[in-house]
């Protein structure tokens, strides 16, 4: 039963925060945790850029995380704010499109477990955006682009209107469900998955910058 998962951080089960948030407090907690990526990811990237043997010192789970960071933040040259916008789009697509679609592929809206709807008893079935034009999404893309400009050391010389003109040309990526992906229903399953030996694959043609400026956040702000 998901309601008795072992608590972690403010008594919220990790699996609830990661896969099945159902309260505003869960989403705030998720967002605060995700903010840490803009610090943690780039510190790992710097270490790998300076020492290609760095990954050998990590567990398979942490190694996969770093490879995923590199694949997101270093797959293309970053020279101006528009490049940062496309990285922001990739972040949005991964978190709010691909992962949600994979979640619904694993657990469809009508999925049943022991004669009961899976999406019940505190689980709220997510909905998917099929466009980028809501003010909420524009706010996300604008804020993330500015944040990435700070990290990459790029001047934020753009207006919201200029950003929106580029967003009008954005295309929703095709989704191909991954048959091998398993999504934990509770913290016990999540812990077991962390111990698997599945390896992430690093992309070719990595583009590192000479300087990164990881961003730190005060969680109480």
Language-model regions: role of each:
Residues 1-221:
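E1/E1-like adenylate-forming module used to activate ubiquitin-like modifiers
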